[in-house]
Structure formats: C-alpha cells, structure tokens
From Swiss-Prot:
It holds the Pfam family F-box. This is Putative F-box protein At3g16210. Residues 1-48 form the F-box domain. InterPro entries: F-box-assoc_dom_typ1, F-box-assoc_interact_dom, F-box-like_dom_sf, F-box_dom, SCF_F-box_component. PROSITE patterns: FBOX. Gene3D superfamilies: 1.20.1280.50. SMART domains: FBOX. It comes from Arabidopsis thaliana (Mouse-ear cress).
Length: 360
C-alpha cells in the first residue's frame, strides 16, 4: 500500500469507517480507491457492518436497532426529496442495504440511507399503483435491476430497468395470465425475484423471475397451504421461506424451500407464544414478518377492539416481538414512540457493492 501504512493495516482501519467516510477516502489516492472498490474488501466490509432495521411509518423513514436495548429509540432518516412525494401508499423494496421507493409522480427512487446517495428511476411509460415490483442483483451481468409487470388488456408485460444502461427494456409477454398477487413487493434471493400469485383459491403459486435470463416459472406453495389467511415471502439462512398465518388456529408456520423445490416446515408457533392473557381483549392479527441477520424472527401484530367505551385511538394496538430461534423464546420489542403507523420493516446492512454499481 505504501512504505508508511501496510495494506493489511489499511484494511483494518477502512472496514471500520462509515460509507460516507469511505467515499471521501476514495479520493486520497488511486491505490485506496482500488482497494475500496475491490470485491474482497466489499465482502469484508459487509460482514463486519452492524445490521440495522429500516422502517417506514407516519410518512417517514426511521433507523431502528430491534436487537439492541429496549425501549428502541427511532432515529429519523433525512429523506432526500420533498416529503410530499411519499404517502401511505408508498411501496418500499430493499436489496443490499439500499431502498427502492415508489413516488407519487409514478417514478421510483433508489436510495442508500447509509451513504445518503439516491437516484431517480424514470417511469417505464405505463405505470399503475397495483403493478408488482422487484429490485435485485443480476450476478451474470454484474448489474442491479428493477422489474415491474404491466398489465394491458389480455397481456402482462415484464419491464426491466438496468442501472448499467440507465434505461427500461421490455423483456417478456405473458398472454392471459389473469394473476393477482398477495403483495406487490418482490422478494430477492440470489438472482431471482419471487411473488405469491393466484388465479383462484385453488390455483396459488409463486411467480419466480430470473434477473439474468428474464425468464419466469411457477413454483408450488406448501401442500398444507389450505386455510391460510395471510402469507409472506422472505429469506432465512440463504433460503427462500414462506411465513403463513392461519387465523382459525391462531398459528404461524414458517417453511423453507429446498434445492429440490420441496418445502420443509421449520417453525410452528401459536399466538399464545406472543400475546399475553391480559392483552387478549384485542383481536390480534399478524401484519408482517421480517428476519434478522441471525435468522431470528420479527413479528408485528395489529390488535383490534370495537368496545364502544374505548376512545377511537385506543381501539387499535400494535405490538412487535423478536423470536429467537436459538432458544425458542420471544420478547416484546418496546419503543419510545407509538407503533400506530408502522407499515414496513426490513433489515439493512451497509454494503459497498451496490454503491459501487449504482451511484458511481
């Protein structure tokens, strides 16, 4: 590295800096720039970076440490655009520590809350608030991509935005799909995006889109999917997983997809594992589920009570729990601020790879 600072020592120092500081250190010399851009350094930096949760509620973004001390202090993030560009309908996706946010003018914004960099993705031409969206990395072409399916008449067309070219392209057309989706937000794993889709209660499946080949296929859901009220896709232990909530049984089930395409159930929890007897005056439902870097489970519940003697603001209650898979124990995550408007939660880790590909 230099006669004054060995490369090993420089790496030990640089991996402890923030992304904002690293952006400045890139300008010190060509050697440091090449080191910071090196894939090996990028992986080391990601592995050593602490994980934080990013949440979206009350039309603002916050950084949380769900696994740290309680009560959790919410640190408001500086949104880079005018606050009027987002509202309750805003859709948020994430990949490699970077968020993809829908804006009210039908454009998208890719934003890294760690480096504070952002980029506007133009409207693909025809956009609806119901279009499914995905954001992920294509390792074959070393490029990040945004995917949306646009339905017109009897055809669903996949449009892909490539950051390498800075433009949208039409990739494939599916005739007469008549598909509906559990959640418009796609789940990213390896080089694939996944959505839960259905035509009817008897025809349910997972839509899988390959970011490298721009091809799609249909994957089966778990065979015991009947009776499920809500379901969410996620990633745990580098495997695609599905969390299912069966309201009649008040049961949460989590299964992972094996390489063979079959499903293996890994967790089954009853509502009583989280909600105390005193709190059961509320009718709690699972609102959404997230996984931590340690493969623990973060479950958010919304409870309803229509008792006429209660004030309107008291009839709805939100609770969040951290379920630790190692010792099979759950603990309530308490916040300094109320959770009434919480709509999105994902774990983000600072990583240089996406910054090096999108923002430079």
């Amino acid at each position: 590295m230099s006669k004054f600072l060995p490369e090993e020592l420089a790496i030990e120092i640089l991996v402890r800096l923030s992304m904002k500081d690293l952006a400045r250190f890139r300008c010190v010399c060509k050697t440091w720039r090449d080191l910071i851009n090196d894939p090996g350094f990028t992986e080391t930096y990601r592995d050593m970076s602490p994980a934080k949760f990013v949440s979206f509620y009350d039309k603002n973004f916050y950084m949380l440490d769900v696994e740290g001390k309680h009560p959790v202090i919410t640190n408001k993030l500086d949104f880079p655009l005018d606050q009027s560009m987002i509202d309750e309908s805003t859709c948020v996706l994430h990949c490699d520590g970077t968020l993809c946010v829908t804006l009210k003018n039908h454009t998208l914004m890719v934003w890294n809350p760690f480096s504070k960099q952002f980029k506007i993705v133009p409207n693909p031409g025809i956009y609806q608030d119901s279009n499914i969206l995905g954001f992920g990395y294509d390792p074959v072409h070393d490029d990040y991509k945004v995917v949306t399916f646009i339905d017109r008449l009897d055809v669903s067309t996949a449009h892909v935005f490539e950051f390498r070219t800075g433009s949208w392209g039409e990739s494939l057309r599916i005739s007469y799909p008549d598909w509906h989706y559990r959640d418009r937000r796609g789940t990213f794993l390896d080089q694939y995006l996944y959505w839960i889709a259905y035509r009817s209660s008897a025809d349910r499946f997972i839509l899988c889109f390959n970011l490298s080949t721009h091809e799609y296929r249909k994957l089966p859901l778990p065979v015991y999917n009947q009776g499920v009220t809500s379901s969410w896709l996620g990633v745990t232990s580098q495997k695609l997983c599905i969390t299912e909530y069966e309201m009649c049984k008040k049961e949460i089930r989590i299964s992972v997809m094996e390489k063979t395409g079959s499903w293996s159930k890994i967790i089954s929890l009853s509502m009583s594992s989280f909600i105390s007897v005193q709190d059961r005056i509320y009718d709690y439902q699972v609102e959404f589920v997230s996984f931590t870097r340690k493969n623990d489970l973060v479950v958010t519940f919304t409870g309803y009570n229509d008792h006429f003697e209660m004030e309107p603001e008291e009839r709805t209650k939100k609770k969040m729990f951290l379920y630790k898979t190692g010792n099979e124990r759950s603990e309530e995550v308490r916040f300094c601020n109320p959770l009434a408007g919480l709509r999105f939660l994902c774990e983000c880790v600072e990583t240089l790879k996406i910054v090096n590909r999108i923002f430079i």
